[in-house]
């Protein structure tokens, strides 16, 4: 902006300060008298600096503006519009009602990891697919002896992993340290495709994995991975406890069976560039059989910003354990979403509560296993303890000591039917979810596209009866 012969320029309209420049380029700001109709505004308490002008002034501009006798340099033009010669006005973001210029340059958090392509072949997928990170299998196997209900064999989990690792690229007795540490959502859905209500869409996902993962052992790997998930539920080492969210795939580098994947772990998926010049931007997509619009199912309307969740649904029927995974959108936060999950998956909730203890080989309960509350309260000889003395062992040691035996009885773990984690949100009043069939190699697979997903993974929330 050329100043010409002007010695000052007004920034804003109805401002409390005016910026002056001299021949040396020095800048000073002076107050102006209040325009007619605008009251004085006291800043702070007591006597001090008094400003005049509109409630919203552009006092932040000195940090963005560098003035010389001939020009004004604006460091960040995002959100600035020129309304007339010599006048600069800030364009207000009507959606966020914010003056933050940085909102036009959203921050991104990218993550990268090297993995074997046993459970995730990035060449067969498109950017935007959710990727799941797997913990080391020894963590699950090590926790199975303590979590397995009495009467069930914790070694079944070790045997299921051994059978699966025989089909791994690295083999069962690998000592290189490389392992399949990432899992694609399509592979996870394909391994349990028989459990989804939309059979045609689920079979299309399985056909896509079999056709495009380019490994003759892919079908066996899918079957054994599904059996491994069943063994995790049977031993109460639930899959969600050993899986975390990696992010939305954007690019990869692959050589033989080793791949380096880059994903968006925080921020808007469309804000990151892919390594495909034909499609430089990507949106999140999920298999259609694994997508769930909770608000639509509950008939709550669609015009609202939505959260995005990843849900694991379990069935604890012995030897017929079930595992399903969904990506769901809903206006509910993490607390209210649990009630929606309980309503939508009431069959799994009831079945897990009834059959979660099947096969338990626990000892018979002692005749006096129940707390004799009525006898204790009616007996005058039993010691009492006032509430103010509950932290005093001298008083509590004399009370009736009751240690119940919960082996073989229903508990929170045996009644667990689901777990969910918030992946992020779609910050739009009218979020767009589009279902269409996409071509993956020689296979057509129905998918659902989610636009403007902002990744912000949280913690797992477990649901029990």
UniProtKB/Swiss-Prot annotation:
> Known Pfam families for this protein?
Herpes_VP19C
Taxonomy, superkingdom:
Viruses
Q: Which GO terms describe its molecular function?
A: DNA binding
Q: Where in the cell is it found?
A: Virion; Host nucleus
Q: How does it assemble?
A: Interacts with TRX2, MCP and capsid vertex component 2/CVC2.
Q: Give the protein's biological function.
A: Structural component of the T=16 icosahedral capsid. The capsid is composed of pentamers and hexamers of major capsid protein/MCP, which are linked together by heterotrimers called triplexes. These triplexes are formed by a single molecule of triplex protein 1/TRX1 and two copies of triplex protein 2/TRX2. Additionally, TRX1 is required for efficient transport of TRX2 to the nucleus, which is the site of capsid assembly.
Q: Which family does it belong to?
A: Belongs to the herpesviridae TRX1 protein family.
What is the protein's given name? Triplex capsid protein 1
Q: Which organism is it from?
A: Equine herpesvirus 1 (strain Ab4p) (EHV-1)
């Amino acid at each position: 902006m050329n100043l010409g012969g002007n010695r000052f320029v007004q920034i804003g309209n109805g401002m409390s300060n005016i910026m002056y420049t001299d021949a040396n380029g020095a800048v000073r700001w002076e107050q102006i008298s209040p325009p007619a109709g605008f009251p004085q505004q006291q800043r702070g308490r007591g006597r001090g600096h008094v400003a005049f002008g509109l409630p919203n002034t552009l006092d932040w501009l000195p940090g963005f503006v560098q003035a010389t006798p001939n020009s004004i340099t604006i460091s960040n033009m995002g959100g600035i519009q020129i309304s007339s010669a010599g006048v600069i006005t800030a364009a207000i973001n009507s959606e966020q009602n914010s003056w933050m210029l940085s909102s036009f340059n959203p921050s991104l958090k990218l993550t990268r990891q090297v993995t074997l392509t046993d459970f995730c072949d990035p060449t067969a997928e498109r950017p935007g697919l959710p990727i799941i990170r797997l913990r080391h299998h020894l963590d699950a196997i090590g926790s199975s002896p303590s979590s397995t209900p009495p009467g069930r064999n914790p070694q079944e989990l070790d045997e299921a992993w051994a059978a699966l690792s025989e089909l791994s690229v690295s083999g069962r007795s690998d000592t290189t340290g490389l392992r399949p540490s990432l899992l694609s959502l399509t592979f996870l859905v394909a391994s349990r495709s028989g459990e989804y209500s939309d059979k045609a869409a689920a079979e299309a996902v399985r056909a896509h994995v079999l056709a495009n993962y380019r490994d003759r052992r892919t079908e066996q790997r899918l079957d054994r991975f599904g059996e491994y998930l069943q063994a995790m539920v049977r031993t109460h080492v639930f899959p969600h406890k050993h899986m975390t969210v990696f992010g939305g795939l954007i690019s990869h580098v692959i050589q033989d069976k080793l791949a380096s994947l880059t994903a968006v772990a925080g921020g808007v998926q469309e804000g990151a560039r892919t390594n495909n010049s034909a499609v430089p931007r990507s949106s999140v997509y999920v298999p259609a059989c694994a997508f769930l619009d909770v608000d639509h199912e509950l008939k709550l309307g669609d015009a609202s910003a939505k959260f995005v969740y990843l849900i694991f649904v379990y069935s604890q029927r012995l030897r017929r354990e079930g595992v399903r995974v969904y990506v769901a959108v809903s206006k509910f936060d993490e607390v209210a979403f649990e009630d929606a999950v309980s309503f939508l998956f009431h069959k799994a909730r009831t079945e897990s509560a009834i059959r979660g203890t099947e096969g338990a080989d626990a000892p018979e309960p002692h005749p006096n296993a129940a707390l004799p509350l009525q006898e204790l309260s009616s007996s005058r000889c039993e010691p009492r303890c006032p509430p103010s003395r509950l932290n005093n062992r001298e008083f509590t040691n004399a009370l009736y000591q009751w240690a119940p035996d919960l082996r073989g009885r229903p508990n929170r773990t045996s009644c667990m039917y689901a777990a969910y984690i918030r992946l992020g949100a779609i910050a739009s009043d009218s979020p767009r979810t589009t279902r269409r069939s996409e071509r993956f190699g020689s296979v057509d697979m129905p998918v659902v596209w989610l636009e403007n997903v902002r990744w912000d993974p949280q913690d797992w929330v477990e649901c029990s009866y």
